[in-house]
Amino acid sequence: MTRKILVTSALPYANGPIHLGHLVEYIQTDIWARFQRLRGHDCHYVCADDAHGTPIMLKARERGITPEALIAEVGEEHQRDFADFLIEFDNYHTTHSDENRYFAELIYSRLNQAGHIDRKVIKQAYDPKLEMFLPDRYIKGECPRCGAEDQYGDSCEACGATYTPAELKNAVSVVSGERPVERESEHYFFRLQDFEAMLREWASPEHLQAEVANKLAEWFKEGLRSWDISRDAPYFGFRIPDTEDKYFYVWLDAPIGYMASFKHLCERKGLDFDDWWGPDSTAELYHFIGKDIIYFHALFWPAMLHGAGFRKPTEICAHGFLTVNGQKMSKSRGTFIMARTWLDHLNPEYLRYYFAAKLSASVHDLDLSLDDFTQRVNADLVGKLVNIASRCAGFIHKRFEGRLGETLDDPALYRQFTAAGEHIAELYEKREFSRAMREIMALADQANQYVDEQKPWVLAKQEDQADRVQDICTQGLNLFRVLVVYLKPVLPRLAADAEAFLNLPEQCWADAKTPLLDHGIRKFKPLMTRVDPDRVQAMLEDSKKTLQPKGEPQAAEAGPLTSDPIAEQIEIGDFAKVDLRIARIEQAEHVEGADKLLRLQLDLGGETRQVFAGIKQAYRPEDLEGRLTVMAANLKPRKMKFGVSEGMVLAAGPGGSDLYLLEPHQGAQPGMRVK
């Protein structure tokens, strides 16, 4: 039965280029959508640029252009990069569109009429020079708790404290350098708590991965709160109906971009929008997203849709983050790789295959190990897959005028290959791509083993074995064709080249069941070359250059004491007041809604403490668990908006990704005092 499937990826923000971290999601989604089409389903894949918000407005101002000009320029770059990575959208749009304005206003109006929108006055930081309210990230100053300088307006990267911009000492606007003042403003809030019963029922394994469903259970336990959906002028976005200076917050109209892009497709293709988005739609709707935006997609988005009379998603498909060589992407190491830099040096299908070989249906992070990448692509795609065709095609072309035989040498082996198709299809369907790639490469091993055992190059020297040679090579090329069909969602360009070589029209999944017999093929040309390690290294070097700041060469960086001099002297008794203890990190996890914090559960040797640490940009939670560190154990517990922090872990470094937790030497035990 043909299914109706609509697939989306999260919208890339329109103020910068696409990098490999972004591509994890778009490649994953594209593979899944291509697979559905290959199976004969009516599948549409839409996306758009997320084109609103303060960062876009300020970047355009900095460059002396309009926001519209900036998003148009970035949008063209995004679409070029996606096209060159063979991401096949049915429609790519922008949230700065008539369709998006229409749906944003419609959804807001329906929610407002139903009583799900509140208004209340809040206090915010205001830049008197630019005459604009400032998001927390655009305010910096000294932490009111530990005194660390150059901290953002919502939390301290040094000690993990959270606070309001008004509490920040010596605060300045990052944009103008002026000291912000506090002003009141009326904001609009979406009453998420009105939909708790519906969300609890919807948030099941049918719609969410188990890890995500468990996370939602935690949020339900904490209680759902109203969500601020408005921003004050000046702001680049859509004005809220019946207001003079209030705009929809970017996170309200961003997911609505899925609807807007599909509406744009409907207008181009003559599709019925309500068949896909109406409350009684039988179509399937899948959102592929990163695990950092689950709150928006698994709570706010289905609540907005339900409250406005639209259907809810069939499934939210979350994935983890990308690391390179086991570490966060790094500009200094050249591993913060832009899509265009990769394309300048390497085949995009190399990366598509490697990501597929590592992706599963879980939210675990994915590591791009460049040594493993080189070895795996060369072994699997060149040494196994393409090798089958190159070993057999020459005999068919030279000895049999490019014509396959009328029979297979081993029909049972061919049936084994085609029978594997349903299991491989199940793995694709479940987004278990890594398992699918292993199954396909196991078949490729069998195909190569078959050719090795039959030795057509030996038989070709015997005149009475000509028919057998033709049948063996016909068998090998048919096995190759089956594998290409199975890999077509991952390697669309190689598949198209293979179809041309085999003199075939575009293949679908079902075509693999029928062998090619008594069929003319074209002369074989190499379908893929080996990854050259020198080109990988050149790409890394280019990444370093691409990300270097422009302008005059900078003087050598001063040492830490220059920018952060030693504090005033204290008495030994002052230091003795701080009780430093060894602690083992039992558990570490992201804090939803916090850009810089991790929640740590620390074992003090008989007592467990919860600490919020501003180290999210420097460490992955799974890398911390089980490690020893040092904590200040006698600090008064501090109530934060995410919970109570019962101490502080110690780290060195200026902040951000350059933070280094203190670790004791071997032999130290949890609870030991640091003297």
Swiss-Prot record:
Motif ('HIGH' region): 12-22
Its biological purpose: Is required not only for elongation of protein synthesis but also for the initiation of all mRNA translation through initiator tRNA(fMet) aminoacylation.
UniProt name for this protein: Methionine--tRNA ligase
Transcription regulation is among the record's keywords: no
The encoding gene: metG
Major location (coarse): cytoplasm
Domain tRNA-binding: from-to ranges: 574-675
Cofactor note: Binds 1 zinc ion per subunit.
Top-level enzyme category: ligase
